[in-house]
From Swiss-Prot:
Start and stop residues of the Solcar repeats: 184-270, 278-363, 375-463
Protein name: Calcium-binding mitochondrial carrier protein SCaMC-2
Transmembrane segments: 190-207, 245-264, 288-301, 338-357, 381-398, 438-457
Matching Gene3D superfamilies: EF-hand, Mitochondrial carrier domain
Family label: Belongs to the mitochondrial carrier (TC 2.A.29) family.
Gene source species: Bos taurus (Bovine)
Segments in the Mitochondrial intermembrane topological domain: 1-189, 265-287, 358-380, 458-469
EF-hand domain segment(s): 47-80, 78-113, 114-149
Membrane topology: Multi-pass membrane protein
SS bond list: none
Binding site for Ca(2+): 60, 62, 64, 66, 71
Domain of life per record: Eukaryota
Length: 469
């Protein structure tokens, strides 16, 4: 007779037996043969429940909330294939063994810095024969029915650029795991991210339009406040006017995201890194270049967004009418007004956003990632909000100058200005504070934008067949 038992090794702890796998459809006398018994201490029951739920969700094909024997065997086979891919990605030397240096290198590539002692501690937990290296059998035996603590899990749970949309698509693209690339899940993540961005931008569009108005029209002599700005917009064009410019802002998500992702993947190959995931500085370079390519491709849409947000009632009948009138009156060059400060703003925004997010991620993983790399909703939202806020704060003066240059030609009697002359003019007439006009509504929309995009992203993932967090 066969019996499958898993024992979690514990020393000197009160243990309780739990059985939760049985084979349905078998004669009653055989049901006890195919079972899984797990012995765990009572104080670790919460960890056990999370672990059980993860395994059941992964293998439950008929969605009845439990695994029968056939589903369990299928889960083991499928999970072993995934573990093989992870093992190969960690085995930098291709010698069939993983040592402490390879563990440190793999985590360092993701921005997670650990000491050699910490790497050796991880190694010892899996090393059965005391060689201070892990072969495939040791790796498989440890992880097959053990809470996962691996590189793909960190990538899976800590996606940032794909999930959060605060209206400025200047973040460094996310990495995808080997499995996500091979199964085609990557494009589902991008579609979910695009849909989340569309909903998020639409919900926060009134604050975004107010920011643009304050960037262009607010000054010492015209001290526009938030309440006054909303009142002015509603008085001029009614409640619908709060969403002016939102259509083009949503429309540009798809081409910009697609171009940036494709450019990022090509630049990764040009960098020539043999790692599956890039190091932090390589990600910054590749992400900034990809962002520059994407922004260059869709920049006329950025100009249209600003002009549509600033338009008066009846000025344009729609986006195409706006584009035709700009082309006829100002020429093709008008569609690239503010291009230089926009490009210069990519590096501080992307660099600081990435650095802050990776620092917060690393701090959390070092301190709290005991059984899983899953940070939970609130930690993820907090990290995304803080990193986006810091990135925007650093690049905001360039964003303000860009917006004023985009709007300048549409203002009657406005002289032609350059980036440097506009900086000097603002500093001379308004001081350093003038470079941060509209910052308040911009920051006010960060938390709702991040929260809305996260909720919509998670729901769209389920709809598109991506395994939920």
């Amino acid at each position: 007779m066969l019996c499958l038992c898993l024992y979690v090794p514990l020393i000197g702890e009160a243990q309780t037996e739990f059985q939760y796998f049985e084979s349905k459809g078998l004669p009653a006398e055989l049901k006890s043969i195919f079972k899984l018994s797990v012995f765990i201490p009572s104080q670790e029951f919460s960890t056990y429940r999370q672990w059980k739920q993860k395994i059941v969700q992964a293998g439950d094909k008929d969605l009845d909330g439990q695994l029968d024997f056939e589903e369990f065997v299928h889960y083991l086979q499928d999970h072993e294939k995934k573990l093989r891919l992870v093992f190969k990605s960690l085995d930098k030397k291709n010698d069939g063994r993983i040592d402490a240096q390879e563990i440190m290198q793999s985590l360092r590539d993701l921005g997670v810095k650990i000491s050699e002692q910490q790497a050796e501690k991880i190694l010892k937990s899996m090393d059965k024969n005391g060689t201070m290296t892990i072969d495939w059998n040791e790796w498989r035996d440890y992880h097959l029915l053990h809470p996962v603590e691996n590189i793909p899990e960190i990538i899976l749970y800590w996606k940032h650029s794909t999930i959060f949309d605060v209206g400025e698509n200047l973040t460094v693209p996310d990495e995808f795991t080997v499995e996500e690339r091979q199964t085609g899940m990557w494009w589902r993540h991008l579609v979910a991210g695009g849909g989340a961005g569309a909903v998020s931008r639409t919900c926060t569009a009134p604050l975004d339009r107010l920011k643009v108005l304050m960037q262009v029209h607010a000054s010492r002599s015209n001290n526009m406040c938030i309440v006054g700005g909303f009142t002015q917009m509603i008085r001029e064009g009614g409640a619908r006017s709060l969403w002016r410019g939102n259509g083009i802002n949503v429309l540009k998500i798809a081409p910009e995201s697609a171009i940036k992702f494709m450019a990022y993947e090509q630049i990764k190959r040009l960098i020539g890194s043999d790692q599956e995931t890039l190091r932090i500085h390589e990600r910054l370079v590749a992400g900034s270049l990809a962002g520059a390519i994407a922004q260059s491709s869709i920049y006329p849409m950025e100009v249209l967004k600003t002009r549509m947000a600033l338009r008066k009632t009846g000025q344009y009948s729609g986006m195409l009418d706006c584009a035709r009138k700009i082309l006829a009156r100002e020429g093709m060059a008008a569609f690239y007004k503010g291009y230089v400060p926009n490009m210069l703003g990519i590096i501080p925004y992307a660099g600081i956003d990435l650095a802050v997010y990776e620092t917060l991620k690393n701090a959390w993983l070092q301190r709290y990632a005991v059984n899983s790399a899953d940070p939970g909703v609130f930690v993820l939202l907090a990290c995304g909000t803080m990193s986006s806020t810091c990135g925007q704060l650093a690049s905001y003066p360039l964003a303000l100058v860009r917006t004023r240059m985009q709007a300048q030609a549409s203002m009657e009697g406005a002289p032609e200005v350059t980036m440097s002359s506009l900086f000097k003019q603002i500093l001379r007439t308004e001081g350093a504070f003038g470079l941060y006009r509209g910052l308040a509504p911009n920051f006010m929309k960060v938390i709702p934008a991040v929260s809305i995009s996260y909720v919509v992203y998670e729901n769209l993932k389920i709809t598109l067949g991506v395994q939920s967090r």
